[in-house]
Amino acid sequence: MVKKVAVLGAGSWGSILANMLVQNGNDVVAWTNMEEQAKELNEQHSNEHYVPGFKYDERLVATTDLEVALKDVDAVLFVVPTKVMRLVAQQMVEVLKKTGQKPIIVHASKGLELGTHKRLSEVLAEEIPSELRQAIVVLSGPSHAEEVAKQDLTLVTAASSDLASAEAVQKLFMNNYFRVYTNDDIVGVEMGAALKNVIAIGAGALHGLGYGDDAKAALITRGLAEISRLGVAFGANPLTFIGLSGVGDLIVTATSVHSRNWRAGNELGQGMKLDEVIDTMGMVIEGVPSTKAAYELAQQKNIEMPITEAIYDVLYNEKGVKEAIDELMHRDGRSELE
């Protein structure tokens, strides 16, 4: 039974999940590499930069000491940016080597590793001891930290090739407002989680340019087709993409003002440059590196992904958003099912 949990990463999603796990009756330590953030969580029970105005459960403990966070843990939850996932995993392994602990490894991050384009469970599997690899679990689905903080109803998926581990995570997180389903398609769940951020940037850009619901619905639908094509090429179950971690996560990310990726696209649509958007937001926009990864993976697999390619051109080749949309609309006609 899981009772002691280390949450690695105390941004908006990590800190809210940690808070919920405390309220579910678990002993939880949140790890951050920022002393001031740990102090704020411990003393003011707040995390103003990430979740303004929210008061955290006083039982939640934060630390910058990884050994303290990992002491006697039954489960480790990674909620760190993709660019540091491997580094944090390496640091965790060094601690676990000293203690001999064998916790369930869970991650709730969404993206692909920069450079290698590997899924995050693959990154973790390369770093952790072999006996822990089979039990890696991915927690993903349509979920905003702001809504979970308010205890709005949220449903997600726990995916793992090991059913017992997925069910342990399901039990750990379930409560009267947070429901968890299990899935054995870890590839599809992670691909859906990463690639929906790309389409969300496009949806935000449409809004920024003033396009209506028809255009946004079309982009989301055709975007889902692209996500599914690429995911299936890497071994995903196509049915996963019509589930919570596929279309569910895509809808919420591509339509909500809570979504950083949607907000970034909205600013781009209004004429702001990418560097300005990143500086203004001050938080990770996972869809930006995920767009590059998706574009390059599509080239590698010879998969047609015109929307992804258009967003790539806007982000990396300084193409105007309106020009990119016009080019998409003037592509040759074809069957919808191609």
UniProtKB/Swiss-Prot annotation:
It comes from the Bacteria. Keywords: Cytoplasm, Lipid biosynthesis, Lipid metabolism, NAD, NADP, Nucleotide-binding, Oxidoreductase, Phospholipid biosynthesis, Phospholipid metabolism. This is Glycerol-3-phosphate dehydrogenase [NAD(P)+]. One of its GO terms (cellular component) is cytosol. It is found in: Cytoplasm. Pathway: Membrane lipid metabolism; glycerophospholipid metabolism. The keyword Transferase does not apply. Belongs to the NAD-dependent glycerol-3-phosphate dehydrogenase family. The keyword Oxidoreductase applies. One of its GO terms (biological process) is carbohydrate metabolic process. PANTHER family: GLYCEROL-3-PHOSPHATE DEHYDROGENASE, GLYCEROL-3-PHOSPHATE DEHYDROGENASE [NAD(+)] 2, CHLOROPLASTIC. It catalyses: sn-glycerol 3-phosphate + NAD(+) = dihydroxyacetone phosphate + NADH + H(+); sn-glycerol 3-phosphate + NADP(+) = dihydroxyacetone phosphate + NADPH + H(+). NADPH binds at S12, W13, K110, A145, R260, V284, E286. Pfam families: NAD_Gly3P_dh_C, NAD_Gly3P_dh_N. Its main location: cytoplasm. Sn-glycerol 3-phosphate binds at K110, G141, S143, K196, D249, S259, R260, N261. Catalyzes the reduction of the glycolytic intermediate dihydroxyacetone phosphate (DHAP) to sn-glycerol 3-phosphate (G3P), the key precursor for phospholipid synthesis. GO terms for molecular function: glycerol-3-phosphate dehydrogenase [NAD(P)+] activity; NAD binding. It comes from Pediococcus pentosaceus (strain ATCC 25745 / CCUG 21536 / LMG 10740 / 183-1w). Its EC number is 1.1.1.94.
